[in-house]
Design a protein with these regions (language model features):
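Membrane-helix boundary/juxtamembrane motif in polytopic membrane proteins
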Residues: 93-117
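Short, highly charged, low-complexity non-transmembrane loops/tails of multi-pass membrane proteins
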Residues: 160-177
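Cytoplasmic-side transmembrane-helix entry/capping segments in multi-pass membrane proteins
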Residues: 46-57, 75-79, 103-108
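Hydrophobic alpha-helical transmembrane segments in multi-pass integral membrane proteins
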Residues: 62-72, 115-131
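Short, small-residue-biased leader/transition segments that mark boundaries at the very start
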Residues: 1-3
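Interfacial aromatic-anchored transmembrane helix boundaries in multi-pass membrane proteins
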Residues: 37-65
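Structural signature of hydrophobic alpha-helical transmembrane segments
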Residues: 17-29, 75-81
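C-terminal ends of transmembrane helices
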Residues: 33-44, 90-98, 155
């Protein structure tokens, strides 16, 4: 993806997100999501338009789900997201292929990134802070959920491909754990 496409994607995500969910929630989502995606890799669309549409849908769905969920249940989202990310990430795919050494390096760093994100969420969840920074907490929680969902989409797409194509498809070294 070229710089112009990235700029367009992030501009649209931040504008739409800010309009629908608030600027602070959207920025905290974007920062956390980029940090998580850097290490987990997840699903990558084949075309720019497909990527843009999936990004907009994923951001919107995760923000709506988190906004509707009482904060007392955020811990379950964190645990679910952590489990999925730790179990599946990083993944390899045709759109962004990583070497084995790159995969190993990312796998080693993922727990540290998750620790930092979880610690930030726990601090934001504390009673005196939560009242003033609830938007940021929702954005971080939505980003964790979104990253976990991209990994699940990747795995489900691989399983679907194996069911449809059976063993006749070419072997790949894509990890689905």
């Amino acid at each position: 993806m070229c710089i112009r496409d990235r700029f367009t994607t992030w501009t649209l995500l931040i504008l739409l997100g800010s309009y629908c969910f608030g600027f602070r929630r959207t920025i905290s989502f974007a920062v956390c999501f980029v940090a998580l995606r850097k290490y987990s890799n997840g699903y990558h669309a084949k075309t720019y338009i497909h990527c843009l549409l999936l990004s907009l849908i994923l951001q919107s769905v995760s923000m709506i789900l988190i906004k509707a969920l009482p904060t007392k249940f955020f811990g379950f989202v964190w645990i679910f997201s952590d489990f999925v990310i730790l179990k599946i990430a990083p993944v390899n795919n045709n759109q962004l292929h990583l070497t084995q050494s790159e995969l190993s390096a990312l796998k080693e760093r993922i727990p540290y990134v998750l620790f930092f994100v979880n610690l930030t969420c726990i601090i934001l969840r504390s009673p005196p802070i939560e009242k003033t920074l609830s938007n940021e907490l929702e954005g971080l929680t939505a980003a964790m959920l979104s990253d976990a969902l991209t990994l699940l989409i990747f795995v489900l797409k691989k399983i679907y491909g194996r069911i449809i194509h059976g063993n006749e498809s070419k072997k790949s070294n894509e990890k689905i754990s």
